[in-house]
Amino acid sequence: GYVGLPRVVEFGKKVPVVGFDIHQKRIDELKSGQDHTLEVSPEELAQSTQLTYSANLDDLKSCNFFIVTVPTPIDEYKQPDLTPLVKASESIGRVLSQGDVVVYESTVYPGATEEKCIPVLERVSGLKFNQDFYAGYSPERINPGDKLHRVTNILKITSGSTPEIADYVDEVYNLIIEAGTHKAPSIKVAEAAKVIENTQRDVNIALINELALIFNKMNIDTEAVLQAAGTKWN
């Protein structure tokens, strides 16, 4: 997808990596050197020399570090629909091995990784969390279509299920993140940070939209107001 592809392309420039998607048509497209989302150019795809693509789950058995970037939509009642996350966790559980690390990037509520995803991994794999396998959370900050803010120059929050795994996850992301990383003290802190980021942006947009309606009735140029207000330092 538009979140996972830029990430896996960058990793493919550094280490052997498998880009997995359940849709064979998408895999065939990427193998041909094209990306219909236009997030990654044919030239960038070609530069990722250690990247392979697959829709075959068995091809993930040789992997030891998994990054999950599935969407988290809402249902008809406007509640988080974690079905894609659960299904992805079930798939990984089938190929999970001793010592593997699973990192989630999808937007979730604080606690979701450990409450919803980890139990699925344990049930399907038969392995024990923080004994046989480990987890992390590193919220995606991709802005689709933005050619200025790319994967490598956006600071990345990382976290892990133990202090040692947190260090390891941070090291892995630092392979590709030129802007640096911020290692959160826990998975829940990283999850909560993502919620705050999204909430702050939505609240700001809603506030300005409301103010713009008022300014319009007062014949005041909203853009001029924002430019003036933006001169304050805090």
Model-derived features: where do they sit?
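Structural/interface elements that position substrates and couple domains in central-metabolism enzymes
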Residues: 1-234
